[in-house]
Amino acid sequence: MAKLPKITSLLPHSRVVSGIQPTGIPHIGNYLGSLKQWVQLQEEAARTPFSKCFFFVADLHALTVPQDPLKFRQARLDMLAALLAIGINPQKSTLFFQSDVAQHSELAWLLACSTSMGQLNRMTQWKSKLHLHDHDDLSFLDASATSSTRFNLGLFSYPVLQAADILLYGATHIPVGKDQSQHVELTRSIARSFNSSYKEKILTVPDIILNSSSSIMALCQPEKKMSKSDINSKNYILLSDSTGEIRKKISRAQTDNIKGITYGDSNRPGINNLINIFAAISDSTPSDIAQANASCSNAEFKEKVSSAIIRCLQPISTSFNEWRQNRELLRDIAKKGAEEAVAEASSCMHKLKTLTGLSVY
């Protein structure tokens, strides 16, 4: 994989774009791994001349797996409420539902027509969704009835729609975690290829803003990433969890019998995970957290981690519940955000249609 440029600060005329699927109320891993960074970028963009953030609920992407319509409708509103609760401000950022802006799908088709099957075949996300190995390809599905029944075009072409999400708004910066950089690389490749085909630099090739925080792992099984879809609810902490639920889940988190708090020992994945959570919440480093708590017992350290999480999430949880109860206001915010997004997206598509010969106006 080619090395992507990393950006640590915004310059004038910057545009930040990112989305999150409405697969349930976000957990602390979502917050520390990406959403907290969104708020920081929003504030930085507000201080940077002619800069703008576009954040959206990626509901079209969520349809690559079956959804119950009633639950899905609520999940979309819950995610919007969660984004507002963590500090995304519609006065500073454009906040909207992806499905409310038809130009996402329109641009995805244009990009799909210049994206090779080989490029998509090399993507790892659709393989991980089907529990395949990174080196597997489409031919493997012919021999795997189980995988092929769960495989659809939407899942395979997911990265093309994601590229459209980014390129539609002239994104200059994309905040991502370490495991998502492959899709940004593909987006950059698609943009360069499209520009080359039409001999005009019409699509902006975005740079990456890499979140340096360590991945947050499952509390009871720290060898795997924290996930809302985990059947064991003890493995994750939701932004809406109560104080009691947070303390109970942290107290039951996997640790070990080794005395003292140390960081980096591969034999202590549970302690490493708790240190990473504590460090990300307190804007510190794992080594500093370990050093400051070196003499603590595991139980004492868990209590400190619980208290730090509660201080961080309690105002978010309160705000989330307030937003969640005001469905009409949520719809108004989404509608206004969609109008802003459509205005931007329409301008981009008009230029692209003119360039590709689709427009006669």
UniProtKB/Swiss-Prot annotation:
A Pfam short name: tRNA-synt_1b
Binding site for ATP: Q21, H27, I28, G29, N30, G177, K178, D179, K225, M226, S227, K228, S229
Cellular compartments per GO CC: mitochondrial matrix; mitochondrion
Motif stretch ('KMSKS' region): 225-229
Broad class of the protein's primary localization: mitochondrion
Listed EC numbers: 6.1.1.2
Motif stretch ('HIGH' region): 22-30
Matching Gene3D superfamilies: HUPs, Tyrosyl-Transfer RNA Synthetase
The keyword Metal-binding is annotated on this UniProt entry: no
Alphabetized SUPFAM superfamilies for the sequence: Nucleotidylyl transferase
Residue stretch of the organelle transit peptide: 1-16
Residues given in the record as L-tryptophan binding sites: D165
Subcellular location: Mitochondrion matrix
Reaction(s) the record says it catalyses: tRNA(Trp) + L-tryptophan + ATP = L-tryptophyl-tRNA(Trp) + AMP + diphosphate + H(+)
PANTHER family: TRYPTOPHAN--TRNA LIGASE, MITOCHONDRIAL (PTHR43766:SF1)
Family the entry assigns: Belongs to the class-I aminoacyl-tRNA synthetase family.
Subunit organization: Homodimer.
Name of the protein this chain belongs to: Tryptophan--tRNA ligase, mitochondrial
Source organism of this protein record: Schizosaccharomyces pombe (strain 972 / ATCC 24843)
